[in-house]
Amino acid sequence: MFARIAITGAGIISAIGVGKNETLRSLIARKSGVGRLRHLQTAHSELPCGEVNMSDEELKNALGLPTGSIIPRTTLLGIIAVKEAMEQAGIKGTDRAALISGTTVGGMDLTECHYIQEGESSFFSLHDCGSCTDGIADFFGGFGLVTTISTACSSAANSIMLGADLIKSGRCDVVVAGGSECLTRYHLNGFNSLKILDSEPCRPFDATRNGLNLGEGAGFVVLESEEHALNRGVAPIGALDGYGNACDAFHQTASSDDGEGAFLAMSKALNMSGLKPGDIDYVNAHGTATPNNDASESRAMIRLFGDKIPPVSSTKAFTGHTTSAAGSIEAVICLLAIRHGFIPANLNWKEPFDGGVVPDAEGHQDVRLDHVLCNSFGFGGNDSSLLISRYGK
């Protein structure tokens, strides 16, 4: 029998706030962070995005880093979230602690600046995904193990899953796991070429949904065994009771029509936890607001829950789709929902579509949530689901 995985710290930064307190206020107030770009210079400035309302220099100042230092925005966002998580958990980097971060964009905000330059540039080799995680680790003086997960939009969820496995195997005592992603022209242009970006605020699970809004941010959680946390005298803020990953390999970018991968991921998470579908109090859906994803995810949820679907919402209309960081940002949102007793609203929803789930458009407060599912589905059908529980249940 594996030890229960306790969550003892959480940190977040996104378009709806820096830290858990700002994030909570925005969620309760139904205040979206999706809007016009302020910091990213792009030919597609008409596309609404969930941009963190701090420039690179403001982020550096907040962290006490030298002005003008060359640090990818992905790294800066990650440091902010990791710092909050580690401070809450009361830990520092040690030989028995690991840092796992998910990113796909990495340092492209810096690298893309040099593509138009003639001749060779050393910058091409300096800002890959792994170096961004190394930069986060360096800020805290290093960890015993540092690694990067890059599975597109399921990256951060997979980072958390790997962290739990490392603890269960005895390889690490503490793991700081999550993801960080910044907006870049490379990022925006790539998704625009797929024709899945909406020129209006996204509408998850709505009949008129027409694509996603990209976002940026970072989310991290501190994982350790329940025994290790209690021996340190730390009260867990939640528990990771189950998780599952499945890859249906249906298409390079599209979700499978029948939602097979999503169904398997959620089923695996439930099986690991020993819970039944009826025990789930809320589902934080992947809910990108693309016609394809929302239909596929709906089929998977209907298959799993039947006619007793728990409250469902996508928080991407708040933050934008933060791609590789989405799984951990939304995991922190789930922890906030459990702790403060509310269901986040599914913003901008008005009309159901045939075969689609009906989300909680208004949100609810003063509710008790004991077990929630948090879905993150990536390109190539790499689908992951986390089952997060109230500690003590």
Give the ranges of each region predicted by the language model.
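ACP-dependent fatty acid/polyketide chain-elongation machinery
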Residues: 1-67, 89, 227-239, 332-346, ...
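Phosphate/pyrophosphate-binding loops at sites that engage ATP/ADP/AMP, CoA/4′-phosphopantetheine
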Residues: 59, 83-97, 139, 228-235, ...
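Active-site-proximal alpha-helical scaffold in enzymes
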Residues: 78-88, 140, 146-179, 214-234, ...
